[in-house]
Swiss-Prot record:
Annotated GO biological process: adenine metabolic process; ADP biosynthetic process; AMP phosphorylation; purine ribonucleoside salvage
Species name: Schistosoma mansoni (Blood fluke)
Pathway field: Purine metabolism; purine nucleotide biosynthesis
Keyword Kinase: yes
Top enzyme category: transferase
Source organism phylogeny: Eukaryota, Metazoa, Spiralia, Lophotrochozoa, Platyhelminthes
Similarity remark: Belongs to the adenylate kinase family. AK1 subfamily.
Keywords of the record: ATP-binding, Cytoplasm, Kinase, Nucleotide biosynthesis, Nucleotide-binding, Purine salvage, Transferase
Listed name of the protein: Adenylate kinase 1
One Pfam family named in its UniProt record: ADK
Annotated binding of AMP, by residue: S40, R45, G95, Y96, P97, R98, Q102, R139, R150
Length: 197
C-alpha cells in the first residue's frame, strides 16, 4: 500500500559495488540538485548507533556481512521519505535495491523509480579504495574478509537488479574508475535524458 504523500516522489536508485564511489557522487549530486539523499546503509547504521534492540540485531548481521531483511530497510526508507517529501520530492536512494525483490517491493509499496545510476568499476579498484577507507572509517564492514563477502553479495544479488531495470531502459551505467569530477560530468550528462536538469 503506497502512501499518498509519496505519490509525487521522484526516485533515483544509485547502485554499484562496495567502494565504487556511490557516496561521493551522491554528495556532489545533492550539492548541485538539492536532492534528498537517503543511504540505506546510513539509515541502518543510525539504527545500530541508537542502541535499540533492533539496532543490536542489525549490528550482528552487518558484522557477518549478511543482508538485512527487506521489510526493515523498506520501512526505514519509507519513514525517512515521508518526513522529507513535502520539502523536496526528488530522492537519491543509495545502495538500494540490493536484490530484485527489494526493487519490486519498493515500486509497489512506495513509488516507481525514475532511473537507476549504476557505478561500474573493477573489483581490484574497489578493494583498494575500501582498504584505504578502512584506515579512517571505523566501519564494521570495511575489513578484508567482509569485503570479499560484500563483493559476492553484490555479484549474486545486485547484478540481476541492474538487468531488470535495463530491460525497462532505466539504467545509466557509468564507468567509475576515473576522477571524481570526470565521473560526475558523465552522470550529469546522462541524467538530462531523464529530465533532471
Amino acid at each position: 500500500m503506497t502512501d499518498q504523500k509519496l505519490a509525487k516522489a521522484k526516485v533515483i536508485f544509485v547502485l554499484g559495488g562496495p567502494g565504487s564511489g556511490k557516496g561521493t557522487q551522491c554528495e556532489k549530486l545533492v550539492q548541485k540538485f538539492h536532492f534528498n539523499h537517503l543511504s540505506s546503509g546510513d539509515l541502518l547504521r543510525a539504527e545500530v548507533q541508537s542502541g535499540s534492540p533492533k539496532g543490536k540485531e542489525l549490528k550482528a548481521m552487518m558484522e557477518r556481512g549478511e543482508l538485512v531483511p527487506l521489510e526493515v530497510v523498506l520501512a526505514l526508507l519509507k519513514e525517512a521519505m515521508i518526513k522529507l517529501v513535502d520539502k523536496n520530492c526528488h530522492f537519491l536512494i543509495d545502495g538500494y535495491p540490493r536484490e530484485l525483490d527489494q526493487g519490486i517491493k519498493f515500486e509497489k509499496e512506495v513509488c516507481p523509480c525514475l532511473c537507476v545510476i549504476n557505478f561500474d568499476v573493477s573489483e581490484e579498484v574497489m578493494r583498494k579504495r575500501l582498504l584505504k577507507r578502512a584506515e579512517t572509517s571505523n566501519r564494521v564492514d570495511d575489513n578484508e574478509e567482509t569485503i570479499v563477502k560484500r563483493f559476492r553479495t553484490f555479484n549474486e544479488l545486485t547484478k540481476p537488479v541492474i538487468e531488470h531495470y535495463k530491460q525497462q531502459n532505466k539504467v545509466i551505467t557509468i564507468d567509475a574508475s576515473g576522477t571524481v569530477d570526470a565521473i560526475f560530468d558523465k552522470v550529469n550528462h546522462e541524467l538530462q535524458k531523464f529530465g533532471v536538469k
